Swiss-Prot record:
The BTB domain is responsible for the interaction with CUL3 while the Kelch repeat domains supposely serve to recruit the cellular substrates. It is found in: Host cytoplasm. This is Kelch repeat and BTB domain-containing protein 2. Interacts (via BTB domain) with host CUL3. It holds the Pfam family BTB. Probable substrate-specific adapter of CUL3-containing E3 ubiquitin-protein ligases which mediate the ubiquitination and subsequent proteasomal degradation of host target proteins. Its main location: host cell. GO terms for biological process: symbiont-mediated perturbation of host ubiquitin-like protein modification.
Length: 559
């Protein structure tokens, strides 16, 4: 006699289910929730759960006619769903995370796998930190590791979300203390994550000490140390303040200095060189040369490693390659290339993110913006600038990237020997000032400068932005170096001209050093170092000496 297997299976399931529904031969009572009870059959539960199988076959339990099991620590609807699942009934996916937790406890492997698959399909950028919040204690199951990796990869944007603001301390600790080589954050960015969380959460003294111990305080950059010292929550706890003071900054690893990215005009090729310049001793030496001839690239510092991107050479009018140079070990590796070819542009760095903005792409001036998070495989595009611009001034202040002046039309190839020569700054120059909000991904227009300027130097100090630029003066048939100041707390006040002096050169390199603007420039093979005190408005000539054949392209602060 042939029997329809499907019909037979359905009949068996129906018969077993009717025993459950009618409370026939039930020999186990499960207590859930606020004392509610579920009756079931040991044989059915043991067949689907290793936990129940082990429990019901122990010598002390096996003699019981009716066994009681307490599962009140789990969501009662999740327990009901699991019992239905063990009786081969359809269950709801509404509380899949609660079901996953209970199924993992009861060692129901098939159900755990099904729940993991559902959670993986549901997990994305917007939900990952919420799901990790619910599952972080279950680090032994694969889906939790998957969700954690997604959180770690997207933390630069997640720290602004409500899910992060509401995260428990254990998640914060997990993020900052991770030893996963792919997602270990630089020390300064750990401070950013911690302070953002502290803005919305209470933390005990013991917890805060635990977090601080995960940060290499000695090798923090100056800005991050000041942020820790000035934080209200940290200053509430004397032991935390003492911990910071006892771990004074280690100045011996990387001395206070500048890295100058320069070219040597004694050679026809244009290989970028990294030269370390000590501001205090005014001594310098070359530490690395990139074995690619490029000029008019952009450079930046990320966690005391130098990034060089884009530029052009004799064969290519623009490039998209990106290099990372380790200063301490004097090594160079190639990072993922930018999406767009760029030259005459700038790199902005906020935490672990690098922003490539505008610039020139062949004969086109770009409006495009792209960003790269250290450790990622690719760059991604961001909202365009309001106008296409290259050869502008740039600085980072809080969450904003400020763009000042620049050139609105493309410029032809300039030999490296002429990079520091005076250019006609009235030719297609811009007086516009804009800033990019990296949190909300929007561009904002600010008050314009009084005149167009190309390649101005920009630095920030306290709440002010300073622009050092050369303005053409027809009365003297030459140029004047002007310093403008803009207060970021008063967007309507505009730019204030605070000083002017005669200048011989339009290419200036500035750095804020000891509450003064230090200006480095090169003229006729001489290096000139001037200092402007922003409190007294006084100029001081520090150095005037031979600089061999160096043409400096950029200055990068190293602390």
């Amino acid at each position: 006699m042939d029997i329809d297997d499907i019909k037979h299976n359905r009949r068996v399931v129906s018969n077993i289910s009717s025993l459950l529904d009618n409370d026939i031969l039930c020999d186990v009572i499960i207590t859930i929730g606020d004392g509610e009870e579920i009756k079931a059959h040991k044989t059915i539960l043991a067949a689907g759960s290793k936990y129940f199988r082990t429990l019901f076959t122990t010598p002390m339990i096996i003699r019981d006619l009716v066994t009681r099991v307490n599962l009140q620590m789990f969501d009662k609807d999740a327990v009901k769903n699991i019992v239905q699942y063990l009786y081969n009934r359809h269950i709801s996916s509404m509380n899949v995370i609660d079901v996953l937790k209970c199924a993992d406890y009861l060692l129901i492997d098939d159900l755990v796998t099904d729940c993991e698959s559902y959670v993986k399909d549901y997990t994305n950028h917007d939900t990952c930190i919420y799901i990790y919040h619910r599952l972080y204690e279950m680090s032994h199951i694969p889906i939790v590791k998957y969700v954690k990796r997604m959180v770690m990869r997207n933390i630069p944007t997640l720290i602004t979300t409500d899910a992060f603001k509401n995260a428990v301390f254990e998640i914060l600790l997990d993020i900052i203390s991770t030893n996963d080589g792919e997602y270990v954050y630089r020390e300064g960015y750990k401070v950013t994550i911690l302070l953002k969380w502290l803005d919305y959460n209470y933390i005990t003294e013991e917890q805060l000490l635990c977090i601080l111990s995960c940060i290499d305080i000695q090798n923090l950059d100056k800005k991050s140390r000041l942020l820790l010292y000035s934080n209200t929550t940290i200053n509430m706890y004397s032991s935390c303040v003492k911990f910071l003071l006892d771990n004074k900054q280690n100045r011996n690893i990387i001395p206070r200095q500048l890295c100058l990215v320069y070219h040597d005009t004694n050679y026809n090729i244009s290989n970028p060189c990294i030269l370390v310049y000590n501001i205090n001793t005014m001594e310098y030496n070359t530490i690395y040369t990139i074995h690619n001839n490029i000029i008019n690239y952009s450079s930046a510092v990320v966690d005391n490693e130098i990034i060089i991107a884009g530029g052009y050479n004799f064969n290519n009018i623009s490039l998209n390659k990106v290099y990372k140079i380790n200063i301490e070990h004097r090594t160079c590796v190639e990072l993922p290339p930018m999406i767009k070819n760029r030259c005459h542009f700038s790199l902005a760095v906020i935490d672990d993110m690098i922003y490539a903005i505008g610039g020139q792409n062949g004969t086109i001036v770009e409006r495009s913006v792209e960003c790269y998070t250290m450790g990622d495989d690719t760059w991604k595009m961001l909202p365009d600038m309001p106008d296409a611009i290259s050869s502008y001034g740039m600085c980072v202040f809080d969450q904003y990237i400020y763009i000042i002046g620049g050139r609105t039309e493309h410029v032809k190839y300039i030999p490296v020997q002429h990079m520091n020569e005076i250019v006609d700054i009235n030719e297609h120059s811009s007086d516009k000032v804009i800033r990019y909000d990296t949190v909300n991904n929007i561009w904002e227009k600010l008050p314009n400068l009084c005149s167009g300027t190309i390649r101005p130097s920009v630095v920030s100090h306290k709440d002010d932005i300073y622009v050092v630029c050369d303005i053409k003066d027809d009365e003297i048939n030459g140029f004047k170096t002007c310093i403008f100041r803009y207060n970021t707390k008063d967007n309507y006040k505009g730019w204030e001209l605070i000083t002017t002096i005669d200048s011989k050169l339009t290419v200036l390199h500035t750095i804020l050093h000891d509450d003064a603007i230090t200006i480095l420039h090169w003229y006729e093979s001489c290096m000139i170092q001037d200092k402007f005190n922003i409190d007294t408005y006084k100029w001081t000539n520090i150095c005037y000496q031979r600089s061999n054949s160096y043409i400096v392209h950029d200055t990068l602060p190293i602390y």
